[in-house]
Amino acid sequence: SKLKEVWLAGGCFWGVEAYMARIYGVYDVTSGYANGNKDNPTYEEVSSGKTNFAETVHVLYDPDRVSLETLLTDFFKVIDPTSQNRQGNDVGNQYRSGIYYKNEKDKIVIDKVIKKQQEKYTSKISTENLPLKNFFLAEKYHQDYLEKNPNGYCHIDFSKLSDNKVTIDVKKYPRPSNEELKAKLTAVQYSVAVENNTEKAFTNEYASNVAAGLYVDVVTGEPLFSSIDKRSEERRVG
């Protein structure tokens, strides 16, 4: 319930989806079409340029771990915000850049980030800053495209995230005593976490879990990894 969302258009959504999914605090990313003039458009209809949809990714994130300002700042690293209806080699109104929101409070942050980004350019930023009118998921084959096709087309430079390092303050996650852990954990959890034993494969309650979220240390609660990093053929991860 505490997760927030924003919709970002930055050219071909394959690369934008994969890029945003790598940011710490992002739980899920899906590709789709935003702010067009018909229901349930197909990729071919969007590509025609007649529906006014923008290829867009829906970003679901935890504001306790990454701020909207940070997300947008990282987003601006990989787009040309002064280019109209074009990103990289992709040309057409479906490839325009945009930031779309539902919460009016988010617009304050978006305005702030755009104003700061404008200082870097002599040309006026043309990135849209609009309420989300509609959003439709793209076809299944577009989801996680670069994960399924590592050598597929991408206009995004992933090295732009090289300085996005995560640090965990371990002091915030003290280890309880064994007595406390025995009272808190199940027998299997205690055996694995404290006594260094192993559990039978695929018996853990999270083995087939498909919900977006953050996996934490059962002993201390320290963050370990995001559901984005969990791989499963049956689960589409952002």
What is the meaning of each model-derived region?
Residues 1-236:
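Flexible coil/turn and secondary-structure edge motifs
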